[in-house]
């Protein structure tokens, strides 16, 4: 590590200093996090997605507007993404500068500290002042997670080694929460050791792998569009992609003639094989497709896709019968044997049945996807309220930062679930019209 960095030369640590008699924000001195992270290769991309340096200040004092001393204990959370840490001696000098300064109330002191520390750290800092009385019943709680201190392992090296982090970029997705009470860091100036407890929660590569997968899928979709539009790789696609939540569904309309499924390739093929059995297909066309409407020719009374799907079914499938194609009705116009004709007719009926069942299944999936999206939107609304609740409790000093962060993470997860559910709605809607061989007004 480069502990000879110029940013350390002006630090007051290790030097004789005078205590300030009045509040002075300029006493705070930053220490860049990059001094340690550069050597580990994690300055730009940290192998963790949540974390904070937590300080507890047991000696906070100031004067109220009448000059009466006030005391409190402060919990200070320095976000892991901040550019700087705050040098400990300058931190103590800064806190002691409050001793003879007047402030209106707890909130004024808390806001002042939070503003000053955030500017020094160049990142998010949360400060919570707690009255001393709060700690009368305060318990020492163990951090959640698996403690790794009691492992039966042999250690021979105590130096920094970036290779120990190489598994953080493996293809294996791992999620774990670890706790250790053996965290030790040496002061950059005096080399004195500081001990602490470290809690690490890792969600290794999950979000990053998902992002890569989505980018690959998008590139594949763009390739398809380029092929359709005959565009070269260096030519602009000139397509604006709207936010998925702004994409409106066309709406599924089942109030259309059943004959629409005749446009399906499988039904068309079966129809062609059957029609080729007739000596004169036009002679039977009026009875085969009355008014060129396949739905009016079905044995069921249904004339639309919507009503056909509500006819009694057996074993979960729609039963289709075409009496106008019976052998006794059309044998005078058939040029193949009865057995071959019956095979072609049954194949035709099965294709129609399969098509209607396909529409039915896809429409059910569409309605389920809509219900799922609606439920997830309600869940997300509740999660937003819960996050705000814990945020208010934290700002009021009655809840831990961890509880707020967990709630915020749950809210973000529900937001991602909504995006996926909207995508499923669009996919299932397209599947309905694909099974109907197109969109019909």
UniProtKB/Swiss-Prot annotation:
GO terms for biological process: transmembrane transport. This is Uncharacterized protein HI_1340. GO terms for molecular function: efflux transmembrane transporter activity; transmembrane transporter activity. It comes from the Bacteria. One of its GO terms (cellular component) is membrane. Belongs to the outer membrane factor (OMF) (TC 1.B.17) family. Pfam families: OEP (PF02321), QueF_N (PF14819).
């Amino acid at each position: 590590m480069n502990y000879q960095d110029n940013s350390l030369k002006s630090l007051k640590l290790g030097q004789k200093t005078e205590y300030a008699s009045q509040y002075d924000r300029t006493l705070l001195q930053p220490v860049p996090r990059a001094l340690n992270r550069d050597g580990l290769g994690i300055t730009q991309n940290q192998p963790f997605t949540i974390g904070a340096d937590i300080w507890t200040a047991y000696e906070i004092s100031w004067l109220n507007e009448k000059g009466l001393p006030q005391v409190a204990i402060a919990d200070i959370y320095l976000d892991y993404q901040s550019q700087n840490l705050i040098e400990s001696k300058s931190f103590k000098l800064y806190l002691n500068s409050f001793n003879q300064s007047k402030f209106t109330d707890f909130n004024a002191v808390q806001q002042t500290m939070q503003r000053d520390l955030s500017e020094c750290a160049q990142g998010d800092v949360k400060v919570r002042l707690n009255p001393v009385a709060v700690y009368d019943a305060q318990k020492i709680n163990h951090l959640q997670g698996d403690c790794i201190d009691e492992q039966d392992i042999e250690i021979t090296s105590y130096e920094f080694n970036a290779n120990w982090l190489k598994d953080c970029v493996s293809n294996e997705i791992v999620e774990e929460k670890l706790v250790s009470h053996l965290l030790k860091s040496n002061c950059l100036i005096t080399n004195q050791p500081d001990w602490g407890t470290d809690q690490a929660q890792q969600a290794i590569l999950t979000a990053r792998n998902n992002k890569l997968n989505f980018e690959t899928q998008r590139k594949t979709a763009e390739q398809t569009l380029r092929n359709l539009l005959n565009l070269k790789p260096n030519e602009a696609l000139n397509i604006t992609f709207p936010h998925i939540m702004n994409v409106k569904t066309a709406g599924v309309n089942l109030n259309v003639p059943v004959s629409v499924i005749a446009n399906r390739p499988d039904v068309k093929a079966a129809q062609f094989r059957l029609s080729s059995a007739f000596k004169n297909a036009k002679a039977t066309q009026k009875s085969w497709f009355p008014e060129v409407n396949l739905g009016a020719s079905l044995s069921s009374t249904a004339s639309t896709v919507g009503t056909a799907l509500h006819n009694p079914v057996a074993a979960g499938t729609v039963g289709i019968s075409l009496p106008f194609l019976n052998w006794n009705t059309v044998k005078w116009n058939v040029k193949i044997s009865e057995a071959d004709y019956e095979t072609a007719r049954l194949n035709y009926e099965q294709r129609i049945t399969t098509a209607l069942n396909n529409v039915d299944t896809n429409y059910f999936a569409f309605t389920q996807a809509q219900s799922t999206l609606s439920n997830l939107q309600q869940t997300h609304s509740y999660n937003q309220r819960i996050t705000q609740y814990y945020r208010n409790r934290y700002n009021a000093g009655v809840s831990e930062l961890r509880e707020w962060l967990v709630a915020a993470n749950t809210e973000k997860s529900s937001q991602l679930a909504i995006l996926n559910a909207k995508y499923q709605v669009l996919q299932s809607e397209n599947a309905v019209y694909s099974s109907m061989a197109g969109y019909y007004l």
